[in-house]
Structure formats: structure tokens, C-alpha cells
Amino acid sequence: DRLIHLREVEKLNFSFIIQVDTLCHRLPNFIAKCARAGVKKVFIGLENINPDNLLAAKKRQNKITEYRTMLLAWQKAGVLTYAGYITGFPGDTAESIIRDVEIIKKELPIDVLEFFYLTPLPGSEDHQKMFRAGAWMDPDLNKYDLYHVTAGHPKMSREEWDFAYREAWRRYYSFEHCETIMRRAAALRAFGNTLFAVSWFKGCIEIEDVHPIEGGLLRIKDRLSRRPTMPMEPAWRFYPRYFAEVVSKTARWVWLYGRLRRIYLRIKHDPKRYEYTDLAITPVADDEAETHQMFQTDSGQAFLDRQRRLERARKDGGGDKPEPMVAAE
């Protein structure tokens, strides 16, 4: 309320990004107030759409039956949705990761999705367990950035996991799906920074080969900044190669942004842009969960069964007692 006062009464112009959990939309007026307070982007800890993987991540509060309702609530408030998705849970395979990405593209209206490797970060519980079990972990701490494979997987080889991870990025940020993202945003009147966001994420992966949270418009390299074990590259070789790299990447960035901007302008000037609809931006019906691909797995059906039992128990108990919630992680 104080932030709203500063913006609407004191006329201070500011905006920010917040991080929330997947049940924040249940808090009365929370999303509407966030939008008025200046929230332009919201990071949502989606983590996964597989119920077993969510339990492994200790995300019991994440209810996949409510993902779309929550995402639509943010988008209708004009806030760009930004979610993280972890690959490499024990039950994952290359095929299941790719399948889940295709389901997300079809059924969830996420603007920006970033992918991570499941990583045993030093100091975490996972790292401690793996260390005590004597499991292999990459000794190079520079790779613990969630963008490199740093541990083994029970069902995938390192090559399979890496392929699935790269394929997830490629499929989600295909030009076809980038257009779908922008069409959804236009239909919901939430265009905002969608063009910049999809350009940034697609370009960082395909041009710079760095995670978007570590990316930038110009990659600065210092010839003298080398690991002690690596030889120093001579100036006559380093600077011409660096210059050529900058020119090449800049040209690719310009081409990429230009192509996406043409898509953006075509949608923006389409008189029927507000009429666009698909499954992801269709309001959720009470009985539609069973028809979604998201639930056409053993774990998905088991999750639905548990939810039905809990709902019956609440009704039999004489009321709808809400589950404990927190508004931000």
C-alpha cells in the first residue's frame, strides 16, 4: 500500500521485479496491488510440472492444477511472467524433459522460461548427501552456475542430459513459439517488454552460449584474465579474433532482433490481435484437468487423485479451510 501511495500520490516513477510462489494468486487483491505498486515482472518458482519431481525439490506448495490460473492472473494485470524450470531430477529422461517442454508451450501462458541443470551447489543439502555417498561431482567450481552438468544422473548419460537441456531451450525459443508468446501477450493486452525479453533469452543461448541471467549486450574479454594453468594468448592473435567475434555477434544480434521485431509489429498492427486464443490463455474450467497432457502420466493422475481426496475431506469436515500460504519465497 505504501508503494502504491508513492506511485499514485507522490508520483514517483519506479518499477521492479519480485519473486513469488505458485499460490500467491489466492491472496486477496495481491496481484492487483502488485501491479499498482510498480511490479512489471514476476519470477515464479515453477521448477517442474511433474508432481514427483516437485516433491523431490521440496516444493509441496506447487500445485500444478493451479499453474494456469495463477499465470493468467498475472498476465491480465499486465505483468510479465518469468519462470524457472529445473532439468535433471532423478525421474527425468531426455524424452520426458522434451515432452514436458512441449506441454508447457501448449498449456501454460509463460512469457519467459529459463532452464537450469539440477546442481548440487556447495553448501546445499544435495551437495552434502552426494559428498557423503562418494558420488561424482565436477571438481571445477567455475561450472556450478546451473548452466553446466556437474553431477551424474541415474537415467541419463551426460551427453543425453546436455542434449535434452539444449533442446529445451531451442524448442521453447523457436521463432514459432516466440510468435505465440507475443500473440498471447497481445490478446491479454500485456505486450509490455515481451519483445525484448524473448530476444534477450533467445540471443543469449544461441549467440553468446551463456545463460541469460549472465548475459549482456557486449561481452568484454580481457587478454590477461586467464586461469593460472592456461597459457597467455599473444596480443597479435587475441585482439583480431576478439574484434571479429564482436562484429559477428553484433550482426547476429541485429538480425535476430530485427526478425522478432517484424513479428511483433505484424501482431501489433493486426486488427484481430485481441481475438487470438489458445488453450494456454483460456480460462480454467473446474473439470478440465483430466483432458490435459500435463496429467496424462502416472504421477499426474496420482496427483489429481490426491487433490480430489483432499477436497472431499475438506468438504466432509464442514468447510473449506485454506491451506497455509506464503506470498513470496
Task: List where the protein language model places each region.
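Alpha-helical membrane-targeting segments
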Residues: 176-273, 278
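A structural motif corresponding to the C-terminal lobe/cap of the Radical SAM core domain
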Residues: 5-195, 215-218, 271-329
